[in-house]
Amino acid sequence: TWIMAVDTDSGKRIPFGKGGAPSATIADAVCASYGVPFWCPPVTVADRTYIDGGVASPTSADLLADSAVDEVIVLAPMASRQPDQPRSPLMKIERRVRRYMTTIVDREVALLEKSGKRVIRIEPNAQDLNAFGYNMMDPKRRRQVYDTAQITTAETVRMAIG
């Protein structure tokens, strides 16, 4: 298991749990990976400060390109290839950020496929995006997101598997 964070001094992605990465307990690694800018403070582990790995990549799937695995399941909640035209100004901003994240995931998936791996890509559909709203960190939407996922997940996975 790798837990992704970004070293705030170097800007490098750190896959805690991978050989060669700094040593950290799983609790420290999870806390470091949850240092989401503007929501949660950076976390110090062994004299280094870390923030959420999603700052550098929504999935860090590209780190598996040189691995010996044949298949990679990419869970990309911050990406979406769903075409929609939200009306709310805040939703329009959210979609711009999401489109940027999607281009990163597109590149990572292409790299994995180029290296011969089968990739199963799972990301939100239109119903999921509506449930998320413009702020995925909004605790008031948790129930709506959960209920929507109960409806959409099976079909989303079925479509991803092909």
What is each of the regions a protein language model found here?
Residues 1-162:
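Patatin-like phospholipase
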